[in-house]
Amino acid sequence: MELEAKTGYKFQNFDLLINAMTHSSYANEHRISYVGNNERLEFLGDAVLELTSSEFLFEKYSQMPEGELTKKRASIVCEPTLALCARELSLGEYLLLGKGEEATGGRRRDSIVSDAMEALIGAVYLDGGFANAKEFVQKFILNDIENKQLFYDSKTTLQEIVQGRYEEDVRYVLLKEEGPDHNKSFYMQALLGEKVLGEGCGHTKKAAEQQAAYCAIKKLKNDKGDLCI
């Protein structure tokens, strides 16, 4: 399967991969038993992700207090960050969705693709053990961690960057919206005065604003990794 090629992990029990990609809406429509959807695997994957990310942060930030480690872990395992990681694998393309979820843009919904990402971690764990699951998490979630942490609350981070340097706050402007009411896409712009800092798209205005802020932060980084405006 193409997804196996993307992840570099070959399933011994291919049914686990199918299970991980089966949304409850599809299982309900096709009268598949509860254990046939990905919710139980999501539960398991969540635990594997938390342990792996905790160990990673514990080793990477050896002098950091518990409270700060907890905040950093939250920024890694939160829905927006997992959805970002899922999109890097185009995970939404491989989901089995019910007709209703399909029609309302489920393949692009953060909650659905982030849950599928956790289910996939759970499937790798059951199929290949903790070592393989840990390697998967390190490769697709803990990579480029500094940028992914910025995504956790990009609007707050961006505001903190400009605070104290400028009298104006960052503001967000709706550029356009597309699609039917049940599946809209919003396009937002982050501005400082009249200067465009970044643009973003999402299924809600809030999500689009976060994306715009995230793009702005990445754009404001110079080659040395310092933030500058």
Model feature map: region roles:
Residues 1-229:
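Double-stranded RNA-binding/processing signature
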